[in-house]
């Protein structure tokens, strides 16, 4: 993937850039793997906002991604196409299995049309192949990792994401997460070799607010710019700094996004660096 920069023909184009999509081989998705997707506007079934800054955006169709590949062990597949997916930052790859079934997977870096993909403990260590952690050599870069055996890939699924298998001891493998955290994961959990493709996604300059609205993202308003009824930092005469330590709209102090005493904390070998005192 590369990034194409625009010339400053308008204020909105100045400094903006877009992916060149050279890796995309087909523009229309596989119909059998597409489902309708309705917009929520960030509201729950009661109509209340549960996630802020969501609303509008272009209509999308959801592509069914195969995050559990264990049922295709020993069945090779060929990469038929690399496609764009509006629902995620990564590209997706359409696989044609030799038994006739078609499935989408997250497209790793360096995967291209015509490549052969394998699943299972006997698969080769090459990008796109899916194996249990017990069969992957220490030091390998992986993505799309399960947290529980058979639970489907949960970790490292966005563009450019990767995890490194740093050690294996007993029934646990130690993984270095994108955050720097080192965590124990059951060796029966499966992972895909390589890092997720489209790594330059983070370097795109969106250029104008309108492009973010096309993506379904609404403005993020600072608390100090609100009225006191709307935010603890709101109000005051003229511009103010908020007058207190940073808090959320509901008064919760900023930072500290992890729940203390969580059951899975015992699996953390080394915590991520946060820059905050514990």
UniProtKB/Swiss-Prot annotation:
Residues 29-53, 223-278 are annotated as: Disordered. Residues 269-278 have a biased composition (Basic residues). Keywords: Ribonucleoprotein, Ribosomal protein, RNA-binding, rRNA-binding. Pfam families: Ribosomal_L2, Ribosomal_L2_C. One of its GO terms (cellular component) is large ribosomal subunit. Disulfide bonds: none annotated. One of its GO terms (molecular function) is transferase activity. Residues 255-268 have a biased composition (Basic and acidic residues). Belongs to the universal ribosomal protein uL2 family. Part of the 50S ribosomal subunit. Forms a bridge to the 30S subunit in the 70S ribosome. One of the primary rRNA binding proteins. Required for association of the 30S and 50S subunits to form the 70S ribosome, for tRNA binding and peptide bond formation. It has been suggested to have peptidyltransferase activity; this is somewhat controversial. Makes several contacts with the 16S rRNA in the 70S ribosome. This is Large ribosomal subunit protein uL2. It comes from Kineococcus radiotolerans (strain ATCC BAA-149 / DSM 14245 / SRS30216). The gene is rplB.
